[in-house]
Amino acid sequence: MEVTDVRLRRVNTDGRMKAIASITIDHEFVVHDIRVIDGNNGMFVAMPSKRTPDGEFRDIAHPISSTTREKIQAAVLTEYDRVGQEEESTIEAGA
């Protein structure tokens, strides 16, 4: 399994959520609404989830193995960093 595409949109909020991403797996399957979160131990990726009637959040889709989770997280965070550097370059060029 390979993450073949990452689409990312940074969000400017005061909260811990920093971006929302969509990934394509093996050019065949897309997962939307993956969140990039600034956690207590650094940035991490939260899979799409929905709130249950009792108020808990349950993942809609998630990797089964830690290896797959690491691949997804690495791909999304790499794109997050790339987009951030691109935005900084644009701001510096316009200043």
Swiss-Prot record:
Organism listed in the record:
Brevibacillus brevis (strain 47 / JCM 6285 / NBRC 100599)
Q: Which GO terms describe its biological process?
A: division septum assembly; sporulation resulting in formation of a cellular spore
Q: Does the keyword Cell division apply?
A: yes
Task: State the family named in the UniProt similarity comment for this chain.
Answer: Belongs to the SpoVG family.
Q: Does the keyword Cell division apply?
A: yes
Q: Which UniProt keywords apply?
A: Cell cycle, Cell division, Septation
Q: What does this protein do?
A: Could be involved in septation.
Protein name as catalogued = Putative septation protein SpoVG
Q: Which SUPFAM superfamilies match?
A: SpoVG-like
